[in-house]
Amino acid sequence: LKDSIKAGKRVRTETNLGTGAVSISSAAAELALMKVESFDDCHIAILGAGKMARLLVQHLISKRANKITLLNRTIKRADELAAQFGDVEIATGTLDNMLETVVAADVVFTCTSAVEPILHRENLEPCCNGSQTLVFDIAVPRNVHSNISAIEKVFAFNVDDLKAVVAQNQESRRQMAMEAEALLDEEVEAFIDWQ
């Protein structure tokens, strides 16, 4: 048993096997953090309150996000999701307040079940105040029209951008798994020699 624990510890300390986002929601949170450097004073808006939003909130909280606003078509669903994270204060509202919330946010994540884009240049540009906004569209079909990239200081990322990050991280994990396997083989040989 002691040797098993030792082998596991070697894998954790000598490889980065558990690092790197391998889901779209974790990749979105990871990429957002790379772009803003810290979530300490970052206002984050999440549009949608389904499974993807729940996973996203988990990843954001694990990265120390503490200023989160969650909007949904129905306030009940937004409140229910926010209540699952009782140790973090999450503001809630309906999508009726979407544009005001998006403009006030530093980072926006969209993950609604809308079948048409809900954010586009025509509805967002008149509201923009000139501050930088990062928009991560993790919905399928897309919630954000590609034309919002034409708005000054609005930077949009979509599922395709995030899939590239996920694929890169999955390949990296495969490499690390091979390294971990080699370490475990060494530990098995040492154990066999000991017996």
Go through each PLM region and give its residues.
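Conserved active-site and cofactor/substrate-binding residues in soluble primary-metabolism enzymes
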Residues: T19, S23, L47, R73-K76, ...
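Alpha-helical elements of the RecA-like P-loop NTPase motor core of helicases
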Residues: R54, D79, P117, R142, ...
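Adenosine-phosphate binding glycine-rich loop
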Residues: E125, N129-L134, I138-Q195
